[in-house]
Amino acid sequence: GSEMCIRDSSSAMHGLILLDEEKTPLSRMITWADNRAADEAEKLKYTVLGKEFYRQTGTPIHPMTPLNKIKWLQNSQPELFKKTAYFVGIKDYIFYRLFGELISDYGTASGTGYFDIHEFQWAEEVLDYLNIRIEQLPQVFPSTYQVTGLPSKTAAELGLPNDISFVLGGADGPLSNLGLGAFGDTCLL
């Protein structure tokens, strides 16, 4: 038989995990389905600022996005917001647990509402609005980025060789579109 030598990864978009300085979760993950940020989204949606954020990030102003979840957190749970050292998604956190690196891919980052899809970097104007810094977010790489070198204990627990490569992969939405062939300059479904 052949051995697995590479793993790909994917996750649901729009989730938010709040980490402390030691990168330990401060609460349960806030999933895409959590609508507690509806008021924040509604306040921002039709403003000049909201339209600019949409132009820059390509992400509609909606309660499911981490953009509005963070604003909701500031307004409803300011003490928890102050304790939060890092704002990450589920896949970002899993890669941290596996390899000790906070990293994300462009597709997953694009669903946050604070990633500039034109410059392929975190959107500083949106981060200013949220009162967060780039250092509180994962480093962002193309979906083809590979990480190799599982710690021996982790590799043994997972039954994987420690020299296996993990491909950063993407998020469910962008990968679904890719699988359907819905990409390119002139393709619309």
Where are these regions (language model features)?
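Acyl-thioester C-C bond-transforming condensing/cleaving domain
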Residues: 90, 186-188
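"…together with the soluble PPM/PP2C metallo-phosphatase catalytic core" -> "…together
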Residues: 7, 172
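Short beta-strand scaffold segments in enzyme catalytic cores
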Residues: 15-18, 175-179
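Short, small-residue-biased leader/transition segments that mark boundaries at the very start
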Residues: 1-6
